[in-house]
């Protein structure tokens, strides 16, 4: 799933950047790890999102902010929803791209044109770093809350990791969100849970001193269909 926040003056539009959600489609964007710039899109998929966003903004006569959520599968881009308003990702994408979206949107509402604001139109160039937004949850304090991810948002905050590479930015974000990482050693226990269609490929390489456990379906995968 990908998300785009854009500004439109009624004619031209500006997309500061395309964001990619790590969690599966259907998980509320506020509960999903969000990556800028998107790491797994082809140029054709990017061009399609830019084209669709511009067409939506013009057709809806947007004069200000618009948010579009996309799902990408097997090279095809699907539209989940279009919201002619600001979204919760506007502060994030504004900060990591340096494009003051709210300021530019207000100026558009007052009659100015994007072409005269100095940020260009279309898709803004990517920043020379990766920014990962990680949600923060309060399950330890809110007892009895359903921890299953879905369309209802359950996170209570978020943190940001910025680094030259995706993996470093991800690690910074996870550490800032309170996740602890330890090197497996004697006495360690590693829990493995593998998605259905990936079962049967074998567990990852782990130190022999670790105790390995798994969820029921991973430990006893269903036999392959004939």
Regions found by a protein language model. Give the residues of each.
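Surface-exposed amphipathic alpha-helices with a cationic face
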Residues: 203-213
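ATP-dependent carboxylate activation and anion-phosphoryl transfer catalytic cores
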Residues: 1-200, 225
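Residues within well-ordered alpha-helices
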Residues: 206, 223-226
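Short internal beta-strands
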Residues: 215-222
């Amino acid at each position: 799933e990908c998300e785009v926040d854009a500004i439109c003056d009624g004619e031209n539009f500006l997309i500061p950047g395309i964001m990619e959600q790590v969690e599966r489609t259907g998980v509320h964007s506020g509960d999903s790890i969000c990556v800028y710039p998107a790491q797994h899109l082809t140029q054709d998929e990017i061009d399609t999102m830019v084209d669709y966003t511009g067409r939506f903004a013009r057709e809806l006569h947007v004069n200000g902010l618009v948010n579009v959520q996309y799902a990408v599968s097997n090279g095809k881009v699907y539209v989940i929803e279009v919201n002619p308003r600001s979204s919760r990702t506007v502060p994030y994408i504004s900060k990591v791209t340096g494009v003051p979206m709210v300021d530019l949107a207000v100026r558009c509402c007052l009659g100015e044109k994007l072409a005269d604001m100095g940020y260009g139109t279309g898709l803004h160039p990517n920043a020379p770093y990766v920014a990962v937004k990680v949600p923060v949850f309060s399950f330890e304090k809110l007892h009895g809350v359903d921890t299953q991810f879905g369309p209802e948002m359950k996170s209570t905050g978020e943190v940001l990791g910025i680094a030259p590479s995706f993996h470093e930015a991800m690690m910074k974000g996870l550490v800032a969100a309170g996740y602890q990482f330890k090197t497996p050693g004697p006495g360690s226990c590693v829990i493995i849970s593998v998605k259905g269609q990936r079962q049967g490929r074998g567990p990852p390489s782990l130190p022999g001193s670790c105790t390995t456990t798994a969820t029921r379906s991973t430990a006893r995968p269903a036999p392959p269909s004939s």
